[in-house]
Regions:
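PLP-dependent enzyme catalytic core of the Aspartate aminotransferase-like
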Residues: 144-153, 157-186
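Single conserved hydrophobic/aromatic residue that forms the stacking wall/gate
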Residues: 1-12, 16
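Short beta-strand-to-loop capping motifs
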Residues: 58, 131-135, 168-170
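Conserved core of the PLP fold type I
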Residues: 2, 18-33, 37
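Conserved PLP-binding catalytic core of the aspartate aminotransferase-like
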Residues: 103-104, 113-148, 164
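Short acidic/glycine-enriched loop/turn segments that link adjacent beta-strands
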Residues: 50, 125, 159-162
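PLP-dependent aminotransferase class I/II
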Residues: 35-115, 119-122
Length: 186
């Protein structure tokens, strides 16, 4: 990213949607690179997906450019209710930290348990895991979980065909997932 910013890319937009789950934020780079626009959302770590509320951090010039075109491209204008909810979400730091820690703890616990069942679990700093079992097709596991009313994602693309995307839920939900997966592979 730094190379792109230095070598003359006009503008580099970098989403940091999952950074609160353990990633490294690019926000500090904004001061050094005036062509960097960092974007974020309240959908992931703030659990406000239906609100369609996000933000952008960048140089004054980039933000002014966004202001000029926002009504042409933004299909989700921010109303006063969404704005108030966003401010409240930012102010309640204790609740945010508790939820964030719970997701990360549950993610790591789930990762370990899936690993114990023989799954390959890709490293994650998000609120989901990408998992693959060398002896069982992901598409069949996806169907088996759906039949048990457990919803995960399976992408029928070459790069992800062998993987399932498992969103991190409550501990009870993840226990149910593990039990179902264990029953399917045994």
């Amino acid at each position: 990213i730094r190379d792109s910013l230095v070598t003359g890319v006009q503008t580099c937009a970098l989403p940091i949607s999952y950074v609160d789950f353990g990633g490294e934020s690019a926000v500090p780079l904004v001061e050094r690179y005036p062509n960097l626009l960092v974007t974020g959302t309240f959908s992931k770590s703030r659990s406000l997906a239906g609100l369609r509320l996000g933000y952008a951090i960048g140089s004054r010039e980039l933000i002014e450019g966004l202001e000029r075109i926002k009504n042409s491209f933004n299909s989700y204008p921010v109303d006063s209710l969404a704005s108030a909810v966003g401010v409240a979400a930012l102010e309640d730091k204790a609740y945010f930290e508790a939820c964030r820690e719970q997701v990360m703890t549950t993610r790591e616990r789930t990762r370990r348990r899936l690993g114990d069942l023989g799954f390959e679990v890709l490293p994650s700093q998000t609120n989901f895991l990408l998992v693959h079992h060398p002896d069982h097709e992901a598409a069949q596991q996806f169907v088996g979980l759906r039949e048990r009313s457990i919803l995960v994602r399976h992408f029928n693309t070459e790069a992800l065909r062998d993987f399932m995307r498992i969103s991190i839920g409550t501990e009870d939900e993840m226990d149910s997932l593990i039990e179902a997966m264990e029953a399917m592979i045994r």
